[in-house]
Amino acid sequence: MENKNKQLGLVSRPPVIVVLGHIDHGKTTLLDYIRKTKIAEEESGGITQHIGAYEIEVVEKGKEKKGETLHSTQDDFSTVSRKITFIDTPGHEAFAKMRSRGAKVADIAILVVAADEGVKLQTKESLKIIQEAGIPFIVAITKIDKPTANLEKVKNELTEAGVLLEKRGGNVPWVGVSSKTGQGIDELLELIILLAEMQDLKANPNNPALGIVIESRLDRFRGNTATLIITNGILRLKDDIIAGKVKGKVKILENFQGKAIKEATFSAPVRVVGFENLAPVGEAFFAGKTEIEIVKPVIKSQKIVKELGKKDSEIRIPLIIKSDTFGSSEALEEIIEQLGKENGWAFLILKNEVGDISESDFKIIPSEKTLIIGFRVKKKPEVNNLLLANKNLVLVEGNLIYEIKDKLEEIVKQKFIEKPTEEILGKIEVLAIFNPIKGNQLIGGKVLEGKIQNKNNFYLMRAETKISQGKVINLQKNRAEVLEAKEGEDCGLLVSGAKRQIEKGDLLVFFKKI
């Protein structure tokens, strides 16, 4: 096998690790400790809003030499110093797509579970992503330094979730860690290196680069920027590059720390400037010295590019989304889809783009009331005047997914939904028709729901269609006059005002004005 690898030009490559788990279970703090840096500063609200990728170097225990830095070589991952690339994915459920894409590029996953909280919904979602990706994983039980930490409870919950840990009848490795004291961190890194060696990860440093786009954004100063994980070959400055249907040339190449470099190889995370358009997140990229010919995607002119929520809803809300990255755009679509289904609304997406809100966004807005979402973007100067001039435009801005969702729900309820003017009190099915009394209709029926009272108004419904309305002038039960009849009770009604003859099988819906 070793000779065959040499013939093919294959050498060992560092593993790519994805970290998954429930929100606030310590993923970013864990990586921050491992890197011994403060790169992972908290973003607004304490949620990491974008996938980041970081590379660390681990010196094999007992091989350190004072004053000497030991480096791994491309030809042998199993030297005294090993590189490991981490992908840090957000914990909020809205970023499920980004987590899923992160898992696909990874060789090993770390499932983070807090010792004081145990298995949560997003823990199970993360586990499902790992299993679907078919990659080995390690369970890191975090926050073991907390007084409320309960490792046995967590391990039992993991067993219930189908995770069979080592020494508990399974083969899933686990380790308790503390990002506060550093306990268990070395053991975790050793487990990663062990799993990587077992997988025998190989790549060819002489090939043109290929890999995955894990983030894409528009930098207002530098242009289209993409974060890439290289899975094979070598990427160089001035290489031609293509991802999906988007091509470009590597004009700027930086490592994960933002330092300019001339080349990078597997499994390095790099930042590239030079794509002609935003590179699609989750798409494979290819690079090389020869120009890559590609037909630019034709942007079709469509009034509605996507419909989210309840497709057959009577409440249909036109919507434009402007955000800072592709990842954010997808996350917003997830939230909008969920909000629509929860409330029975349909959101008609007219545009979903990365970039600031500008005058051009208003050219596609229909005459009816329309929502514009601005997520972590700015408004061009002319936008405020356009908003003032058009009362049908409603702008929702924010820096947090939660914030956008709450604002969106509140505004839709306030401005897009007609408030009910009536309250339904009860319903009666007509079971019998009697001779009229002084021109008023006399009927018998059963209260199907709610309750009805003497003097209540009602709608006469036939075949689910409102055909007339009237009023109760006398209500009886067992031939005795009463003030009300409740659900399940039989009653007799003398009604007036109905311009259509009431028939057996009709439905009377009783209401009052609000």
Regions found by a protein language model. Give the residues of each.
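Conserved nucleotide-binding/hydrolysis micro-motifs of P-loop NTPases
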Residues: 37, 91-93, 115-119, 143-148, ...
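Canonical P-loop GTPase G-domain recognition
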Residues: 145-206, 346-353, 361, 366-405
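Long, charged amphipathic helices and adjacent flexible linkers at domain junctions
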Residues: 5, 198-215, 289-316, 408-430
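Conserved Switch II/interswitch segment of TRAFAC-class P-loop GTPases
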Residues: 93, 104-124, 133-152, 318, ...
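Switch I (G2) and immediately adjacent beta-strands of P-loop GTPase domains
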Residues: 15, 43-67, 75-108, 115, ...
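Catalytic P-loop NTP-binding/switch module of NTPases
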Residues: 4, 232-236, 240-370, 485-514
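Charge-patterned, long linear interaction tracts outside catalytic cores
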Residues: 225-241, 431-479
